[in-house]
């Protein structure tokens, strides 16, 4: 249930930028850079524009797509294209840390949460809140959610039944 989390050490030009934007999470080295540079050669990066406008604020996506300029990893993180930026030697360890953090959570909640996030994204506000309420109600019936509430009340760490 862990989302695909790519890592990027170097340059992500249109195709790689497209692939990174499609992922729900990403980790990059401080040396990484991103561009949709097709416009520099007379070709608007139409395909990369689809995930970019779904993952970046429209103004940042528009600037990347219309200028073809590179952005560095820190800018990509500030704009929401990557989650974390670390020095290249720490890239694998940081990715492992992120994956481990997700795997240590109750996997039923992770699966339900991911499914709800994907579905609600294309819904109107009211429908999204309805789905969120339904998901929360179903999630609260799960033994791990009940264990989490009990652990919170007892001021202890939860003992998940289904850790990865």
Residue ranges and their predicted role:
Residues 64-65, 116-119, 134-140:
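Helix-loop "lid/cap" segments that line or gate small-molecule binding pockets
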């Amino acid at each position: 249930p862990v989302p695909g989390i790519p890592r990027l050490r170097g340059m992500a030009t249109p195709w790689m930028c497209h692939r990174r934007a499609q992922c729900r999470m990403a980790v990059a080295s401080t040396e990484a850079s991103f561009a949709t540079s097709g416009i520099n050669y007379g070709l608007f990066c139409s395909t990369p524009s689809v995930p970019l406008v779904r993952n970046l604020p429209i103004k940042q996506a528009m600037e990347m797509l219309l200028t073809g300029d590179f952005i560095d990893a820190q800018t990509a993180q500030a704009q929401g294209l990557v989650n974390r930026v670390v020095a290249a030697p720490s890239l694998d360890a940081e990715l492992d840390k992120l994956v481990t953090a997700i795997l240590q959570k109750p996997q039923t909640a992770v699966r339900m949460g991911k499914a709800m996030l994907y579905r609600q994204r294309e819904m109107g506000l009211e429908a999204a809140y309805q789905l969120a309420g339904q998901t929360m109600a179903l999630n609260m019936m799960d033994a791990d959610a009940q264990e989490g509430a009990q652990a919170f009340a007892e001021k202890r760490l939860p003992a998940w039944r289904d850790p990865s």
